């Protein structure tokens, strides 16, 4: 059996994802920050770090990571497949702090990514809510 090299980037990334899945945000933040410092930030690393910060309740730190991810995506020649994740994480942060900004961002996200599964699910839930609400209309 092969042992894992604890310093290998893939091992560190997998460890951070396991920590995230188990709500161990401090360990995940440490691992992801270390990876960003060693290899440079990427949109995926910044999104994962933001998710860990959201779990820990550090919404301002998460928004900082997400802003960095948006800035980084603007520097790329082609759109990043991780960009929708950045918007969804921002929505998660803003939902509890600024509902007006969250609603505006949701509108922008829905316009830019109309076929994204998140947008489709939101449209389905809006329709279901409207149908149930119509049953109770006075």
Task: Give the residues covered by each predicted segment.
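"A position-specific structural signal for the A-helix of alpha-solenoid helical repeats
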Residues: 9-21, 46-55, 82-93, 119-135
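Residue-level detector of the short coil/turn that links helix A to helix B
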Residues: 23, 57, 96-100
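Intrinsically disordered, low-complexity segments enriched in Gly and acidic/Ser/Thr residues
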Residues: 47-85
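A hydrophobic, small-residue-rich beta->alpha segment in the mid-to-C-terminal subdomain
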Residues: 69-73, 81-101, 108
């Amino acid at each position: 059996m092969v042992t894992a090299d604890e310093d290998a980037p893939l091992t560190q990334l997998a460890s951070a994802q396991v920590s995230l899945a188990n709500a161990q945000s401090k360990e995940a933040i440490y691992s992801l920050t270390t990876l960003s410092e060693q290899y440079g930030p990427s949109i995926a690393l910044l999104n994962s770090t933001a998710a860990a910060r959201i779990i820990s309740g550090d919404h301002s730190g998460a928004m900082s990571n997400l802003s960095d991810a948006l800035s980084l995506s603007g520097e790329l020649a082609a759109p990043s497949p991780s960009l929708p994740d950045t918007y969804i994480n921002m929505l998660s942060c803003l939902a509890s702090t600024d509902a007006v900004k969250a609603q505006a961002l949701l509108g922008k996200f829905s316009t830019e990514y109309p076929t994204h599964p998140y947008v489709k699910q939101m449209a389905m839930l809006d329709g279901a809510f409207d149908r149930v609400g119509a049953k109770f209309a006075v």
